[in-house]
């Protein structure tokens, strides 16, 4: 609820505004189709757009000739809901309460995960998962990037395995 209230306050601003947090869609129809897709999936029982309670208007907005999708937080009752494991081209989060023992398998493949826990066992399981492209341990913003992250362009590290190798001469 608190996250939804906070994100509902994010609105379009001028691109040179230091407080700007949203990017406009180059093609307004893409924004409308994404919003319509979310609305269709919200018709499936077990999910609610929590930000809608805090937002003064619709998810799609026109501002100064550009089209924006406002941040959206959806709460799902189950990881099987169609919106529970979706990623979109705008600030979107699906919140699903699940037992820690089901993590990270319940996540499935994903581009970015932020882990906020002191449970070392859970952190180790999530670190071992091959399905997570980007993993933030702690409250790091997902937009904070580093050049040496494979997802951000350092393909050498991503494509080639570094390995220390030692051996004795003549050893088989």
Spans of model-derived segments:
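Generic detection of long, well-ordered alpha-helical segments
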Residues: 1, 27-31, 116, 120
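Structural signal for hydrophobic packing residues in well-ordered secondary-structure cores
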Residues: 1-15, 38, 42-45, 130-134, ...
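Flexible, acidic loop-helix segments that line cofactor/substrate-binding pockets
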Residues: 4-39, 50-67, 85-87
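Conserved C-terminal structural/oligomerization subdomain of aldehyde/semialdehyde dehydrogenase
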Residues: 8, 63-172
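Flexible, glycine/charged-enriched surface loops at secondary-structure junctions
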Residues: 12-21, 46-53, 113-118, 136-140
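Acidic-enriched, low-complexity/disordered segments with a strong bias for Aspartate over Glutamate
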Residues: 16-17, 29, 39-41, 49, ...
